[in-house]
Amino acid sequence: MAPRGCAGHPPPPSPQACVCPGKMLAMGALAGFWILCLLTYGYLSWGQALEEEEEGALLAQAGEKLEPSTTSTSQPHLIFILADDQGFRDVGYHGSEIKTPTLDKLAAEGVKLENYYVQPICTPSRSQFITGKYQIHTGLQHSIIRPTQPNCLPLDNATLPQKLKEVGYSTHMVGKWHLGFYRKECMPTRRGFDTFFGSLLGSGDYYTHYKCDSPGMCGYDLYENDNAAWDYDNGIYSTQMYTQRVQQILASHNPTKPIFLYIAYQAVHSPLQAPGRYFEHYRSIININRRRYAAMLSCLDEAINNVTLALKTYGFYNNSIIIYSSDNGGQPTAGGSNWPLRGSKGTYWEGGIRAVGFVHSPLLKNKGTVCKELVHITDWYPTLISLAEGQIDEDIQLDGYDIWETISEGLRSPRVDILHNIDPIYTKAKNGSWAAGYGIWNTAIQSAIRVQHWKLLTGNPGYSDWVPPQSFSNLGPNRWHNERITLSTGKSVWLFNITADPYERVDLSNRYPGIVKKLLRRLSQFNKTAVPVRYPPKDPRSNPRLNGGVWGPWYKEETKKKKPSKNQAEKKQKKSKKKKKKQQKAVSGSTCHSGVTCG
C-alpha cells in the first residue's frame, strides 16, 4: 500500500508534497528510462523526417505550394499511369528482386488486378486504351505504327480524352504517344488533349531525346503541344522530366475542377539508361542488362511516389482514381522478366499479354483486395467515361466493359472473353491450314482468343520459352538462361486452360477438339467484324532532315487541281455555249400573253 499523500487525487500540493523517500530511487530509474525512450524515438524517426524533408524540397524546387484539400467536384480526378515494357514479375509484390516500394504500397492499399490483359506491343495497347476497341476494329491489327508510315489512329474514332472533355474535364497527356503523327490532325492535341508534353515515338535516348529509326533517319523527338520542345534539349532524364511536368500541371490546376492525366512513361523501354544513383542497390546483379533495367524501374517507382505526393499536396488525392498498367510484357533480352509466365513482349503467350496492373483510390469500397476477374485494357474507356458521368453514343460499338463495380465492390466481371488479336498479314506458320482448323479457320493466321478459362492460339504465337530472371546469369548481355520447349512439328493450334495452367505448360488441343472448334468459330465471328488492315509503306517525306531535324507531321494534302487538257477545255467550251443558247431560248419563250403582267 502506498504511503499516505502519494496516492489518490488530492488538491494541488506543494512541489514536495509527493516526493516520498521510498520512491526516490525508482523515480530516478524511471527518468533515465524516459530519456532513453526519447533518444530512441528521435533516432527511429530520423529516417522518416529526412524522407519528408526531401519530398518537401522536391516540391519546392518545382515551384509548388501547399493548398487545402477540397473535393467540391462530384466527378473524380482520373490519373492513368502507363509503364512501358514492364514485365509481369518486375514488381515487388510479384516476388521481384527489384525494389518497388511505391508500387507495392499503392497496390496493397488498392486493388491488385491479377487477371489483367493488354496487347503484346506498344501501339495496339495504347490504341485500345484510348478507343475502347480491339485493334481489328481500328485497322491496327498488324505490328506498330512506324515513324516513317503515313498512318495514325483513325480520325473517325472518338477518343477517351474527347469524351471526357464533353463533361467538363481538363485533359493532359505527358509521355509517349506512339499513335501516329504523319498529319497534324493525328497529334495528341487534335485527339482530345488540352496539353501534350512528350515524345511521338517513345523509344529514343532518355537524355538527348533523339531517335533513329534507321541509318540516316534520325531526329529530335520531344514535343510541347504541337511544336518541338527545343528548350528541353538539356540532358534531363525523361522519367524525371515527365514527373516535373505532371507536378507543374497539378500545381496550376484548380482541384475543384475535374482533371484527366494520362502519364505514359518511356521507362522501362530500351535503351537501358538510368541516373547513376539508382544503381546503388543492384551491384549484386551480375547481368548488366538486368542491372540497368532494375535501376530504371527504381527511378520510375520514385517518380510515381512524387506524382502521388503532388496529388495529396494540391488537394486532388481524396477524390482521385489512380490506375497503373504496363503496356505489354517484358523483354528478357533488355532486362525484363515475365517469370513464371511463358513468352515475352511481342508474343501472344501469357508473358507477352498478362500485365502488372492495379487501382488505387480513396473511392474504392473494397481496399486491400485482389481482383481475379477477367479485365482487359479496352475496359478503361467505358469505365472512366462512366465514372466521369459521361455518355457513350449508342451507335458506337465498343469492345470494353464498365468494370468499376468489379474492381471496387468485388462483383463478377461482365467480361467472359478477350480477342487478343487476329493478324491476317502475319501468316508465318508453315504448317497452318484450313484443314488444321477443321475447315473453320486458317490456322496459318496468327490469332489468339480467351473464352472464360480457355485460351486458343493459332499460327505462330511468337517466342515461346520460359525465361527465369537473369539477375545472377553471367552469360553476357546478349545471352540468357531459359527453359526451352520444342514445338511439335506441324503444330499450328494450341489450347490451354489458363485457370488451371497459367504457365501454358500442357497443350490440350488434341484432348478437347470440341472446345477447339468452338473457339475457332468464335474467332471466325470476330473476323467478320474486322476492318481492313492499315499498314502503308514508308514515305520518304517523313525523314526528319526534311523537317528541321524533328520527327513530326510531314504529310500535306494535294490541293492543286490539275489543268484540264486541250480536249477537256474544248468540251467545256462547247457545253457552256449550249447552256447559253438554252438560256436565250428560255428568255425569248417567256413572253406573257392575254394581257397578264409578268411579275
Curated annotation (Swiss-Prot):
Where are the compositionally biased (Polar residues) regions?
586-599
Q: Which positions are glycosylated?
A: N157, N306, N318, N431, N497, N527
Chief place of localization: secreted
Bias type Basic residues, positions: 572-584
Q: Where is this region: Disordered?
A: 531-599
Q: Briefly state the modifications made to the protein after translation.
A: The conversion to 3-oxoalanine (also known as C-formylglycine, FGly), of a serine or cysteine residue in prokaryotes and of a cysteine residue in eukaryotes, is critical for catalytic activity.
**Gene3D superfamilies this protein is in?**
3.30.1120.10, Alkaline Phosphatase, subunit A
Cite the active-site annotation: C122 (nucleophile), H178
The positions making up the signal sequence are 1-49
Q: Which UniProt keywords are listed?
A: Calcium, Glycoprotein, Hydrolase, Metal-binding, Secreted, Signal
Where does this protein reside within or beyond the cell?
Secreted
The entry lists its GO molecular-function terms as: arylsulfatase activity; metal ion binding
Matches recorded under Pfam families: Sulfatase
Cofactor(s) recorded for this entry are:
Ca(2+)
Q: Look up the record and report any one GO term of the cellular component aspect.
A: actin cytoskeleton
| EC numbers for this chain | 3.1.6.-
Please tell me which top-level EC class this enzyme sits in: hydrolase
Residues recorded with modification 3-oxoalanine (Cys): C122
Q: Which residues bind Ca(2+)?
A: D84, D85, C122, D327, N328
Task: Give the cofactor binding note.
Answer: Binds 1 Ca(2+) ion per subunit.
Positions binding substrate in this chain are K176, H269, K345
Q: Which family does it belong to?
A: Belongs to the sulfatase family.
Please state what the protein is called: Arylsulfatase J
Classification of source organism: Eukaryota, Metazoa, Chordata, Craniata, Vertebrata
Tell me the name of the encoding gene: ARSJ
